[in-house]
Amino acid sequence: MLIKLLTKVFGSRNDRTLRRMRKVVNIINAMEPEMEKLSDEELKGKTAEFRARLEKGEVLENLIPEAFAVVREASKRVFGMRHFDVQLLGGMVLNERCIAEMRTGEGKTLTATLPAYLNALTGKGVHVVTVNDYLAQRDAENNRPLFEFLGLTVGINLPGMPAPAKREAYAADITYGTNNEYGFDYLRDNMAFSPEERVQRKLHYALVDEVDSILIDEARTPLIISGPAEDSSEMYKRVNKIIPHLIRQEKEDSETFQGEGHFSVDEKSRQVNLTERGLVLIEELLVKEGIMDEGESLYSPANIMLMHHVTAALRAHALFTRDVDYIVKDGEVIIVDEHTGRTMQGRRWSDGLHQAVEAKEGVQIQNENQTLASITFQNYFRLYEKLAGMTGTADTEAFEFSSIYKLDTVVVPTNRPMIRKDLPDLVYMTEAEKIQAIIEDIKERTAKGQPVLVGTISIEKSELVSNELTKAGIKHNVLNAKFHANEAAIVAQAGYPAAVTIATNMAGRGTDIVLGGSWQAEVAALENPTAEQIEKIKADWQVRHDAVLEAGGLHIIGTERHESRRIDNQLRGRSGRQGDAGSSRFYLSMEDALMRIFASDRVSGMMRKLGMKPGEAIEHPWVTKAIANAQRKVESRNFDIRKQLLEYDDVANDQRRAIYSQRNELLDVSDVSETINSIREDVFKATIDAYIPPQSLEEMWDIPGLQERLKNDFDLDLPIAEWLDKEPELHEETLRERILAQSIEVYQRKEEVVGAEMMRHFEKGVMLQTLDSLWKEHLAAMDYLRQGIHLRGYAQKDPKQEYKRESFSMFAAMLESLKYEVIGTLSKVQVRMPEEVEELEQQRRMEAERLAQMQQLSHQDDDSAAAAALAAQTGERKVGRNDPCPCGSGKKYKQCHGRLQ
């Protein structure tokens, strides 16, 4: 009560921020007559003037009034569009490291030109981030004339572009691209083998469009660059045949309940749990199929990978539905983004889930991948010196923006008051009744010429509504992930009188729905339109526009509530843009996922008390409130998941930053010999310590062990026992010095053969390759640690603290391994004289010719001795990466001679 009273007196924080900014808007408006007097050349010259002032030490914030006035004037001259006062407010919010909530149709794209221009004056680059390539390209091309008029360069960063083109795009003053592409470029830059391969500059200012979609909805999805792991596609197919034999039960087994089924599904956490009965059946089926031996347990350590396959297959069948979570197109399983309804080409689920879905759908199973580099959007965007974003719906997530990204949310007022009517929700008992009511509503609305937009939460639901409309003889358009290409054209004409459009989640669609349809689209369809044709099209559009307004504007129908209120608000926000008339209503049923999981008991109890008949709906503020509470529950749960993810990823992030900064330092220097020498000392000291403990008696020394270790690990054959016999005065310290000196001498002899420059280049390559290889293995180990760490909670230990502690010791161990492996590889490398190389090459060519001749012989006579010899030659077993190395060192092949291949 007191807070409400204080807010009334002093205004909310949002009001105070806007009040402060309005004073600056007045200054900008006062400058307008002065700017209008400038010639085009003088207006362009302002950019150079601002840059000169910044170089002399003026603060960027001092330039705001003048810079914004310049952009507004340039926009009037180039586009014939003048920034509204609210757009100037939005521009200032975006410059202050804040999130600007601006309603749909308020001109976010034009608003973004203000802070983009201001921050580009520093010369450090501005990244404008969009949700898809189409929007990045569209916004870049639309705004290019304005920025180029003001003397700034514009770049577009698209997937698949060659490195030189990307480098050029990043070198521009303002770069447009998608969140995925910026993140992947960052990871690729940190896997480069020379400074020239890197494309990004230092991350300075990011301006994120649809910021809630990118920083919240996609925050749980890490960006991963992966390489192929071993092939296990056959196992996915074999395990997939077993799953259809299992029966689902409604509840999980407990002390009070024992079900008849084999597994239960927890829809809230999207997990599948096997029951005791299910485990027994699966083990029987695995034995019957010959996958597992009789008497073995699925939980034994030897079957850990098999358990992984069973879990993945069970999740694929029980949790993932075709045309909801993914579509199958051209024999490929493509993920559908649950938040935007778009397909995510090239993205794959990890942990074998994608392969399990491919096996379920009977398409070709692609190899599993191993993570080479990964980062979450949360951590990528926090790398920027300055971050800001804009969206139509941020206020519901203001707390999350503030606590994770340290970004305040400012709600920017609309240019004209909002007059859309948001009608209360209607709740039906069954899905069929709800769909029927939606069809009736559409019939009523279209009969009076009102356009209707129907929002669904999955492709499956959009096709269900589409089929019902077809049966009812209502003409309509469908916009979902399957019909991606016609997207902009369909949305542009969704405001046509009596038009019916069905769309999956509308987030980030980026095209305004203009009442009466888009006259620009009609003009664009003509080849060479005359002025008369354009005037006629505009006049016809005005008639349609007025008719639609008369009918009540665009009507929005939500076929069910989404988990997040924000996405419902995005759907509503398509109507009532720029003060237009409009209306919206959500239709729900007790069979909807959200109602079933979170709100069923209270609402169905209410419905029973009211004695509802089939086809009747309940419409009451209490119901709407109960649903809003259910959504709040889901939102807070999702927030907790994202926060947890971030807390764990922060540990990996500190390590990632350390590795990447080390790697960049390595890339930028040409001579790493000093580092190599320092590492060599550490490695030899630790190696000798293991066999000659410091300050110990000679009886405690293990000289044969040391000699063998030096030979195996560093290819150093030293007669240490002989030295000690012949030189009694040789003590521990001088012995250590001699071993190190010998290793340096052998290394220097190699350097003399190939030359210093070649050796420096080789050293750098070995360090980079070893670092990348160990980092890749460390990432996999961190993944395994992360998956099982929650079990420490049962031992009364804090899983987060345990994760931090263990991952730190793993990181320290990795850095030690790095030293050993670098020195080991450099010590074992065989250096040849040029004439020796020539001789070996000659031998290799002769051997190749001999094999080719033998192959010809084997074609002529399969039973010949030559064919047998060839078979023996080619049938030699290939050593697996994880097998013991044939050299007898006791190490895995990949960590010994396999590394040198």
UniProtKB/Swiss-Prot annotation:
Induction: Repressed under conditions of excess protein secretion capacity and derepressed when protein secretion becomes limiting. This is regulated by SecM. It catalyses: ATP + H2O + cellular proteinSide 1 = ADP + phosphate + cellular proteinSide 2. ATP binds at Q87, G105, E106, G107, K108, T109, D512. Its EC number is 7.4.2.8. One of its GO terms (molecular function) is protein-exporting ATPase activity. SMART domains: SecA_DEAD (SM00957), SecA_PP_bind (SM00958). It comes from the Bacteria. It is found in: Cell inner membrane; Cytoplasm. PROSITE patterns: SECA, SECA_MOTOR_DEAD. InterPro entries: Helicase_ATP-bd, Helicase_C-like, P-loop_NTPase, SEC_C_motif, SecA, SecA_CS, SecA_DEAD, SecA_motor_DEAD. One of its GO terms (cellular component) is plasma membrane. Zn(2+) binds at C885, C887, C896, H897. Keywords: ATP-binding, Cell inner membrane, Cell membrane, Cytoplasm, Membrane, Metal-binding, Nucleotide-binding, Protein transport, Translocase, Translocation, Transport, Zinc. The keyword Zinc applies. GO terms for biological process: intracellular protein transmembrane transport; protein import; protein targeting; protein transport by the Sec complex. Residues 891-901 have a biased composition (Basic residues). Residues 859-901 are annotated as: Disordered. Its main location: membrane. May bind 1 zinc ion per subunit. Belongs to the SecA family. HAMAP family: SecA (MF_01382). Part of the Sec protein translocase complex. Interacts with the SecYEG preprotein conducting channel. Has a central role in coupling the hydrolysis of ATP to the transfer of proteins into and across the cell membrane, serving both as a receptor for the preprotein-SecB complex and as an ATP-driven molecular motor driving the stepwise translocation of polypeptide chains across the membrane. Monomer and homodimer. Part of the essential Sec protein translocation apparatus which comprises SecA, SecYEG and auxiliary proteins SecDF-YajC and YidC. PANTHER family: CHLOROPLAST PROTEIN-TRANSPORTING ATPASE, SECA INNER MEMBRANE COMPONENT OF SEC PROTEIN SECRETION SYSTEM. This is Protein translocase subunit SecA. It comes from Escherichia coli (strain 55989 / EAEC). The gene is secA.
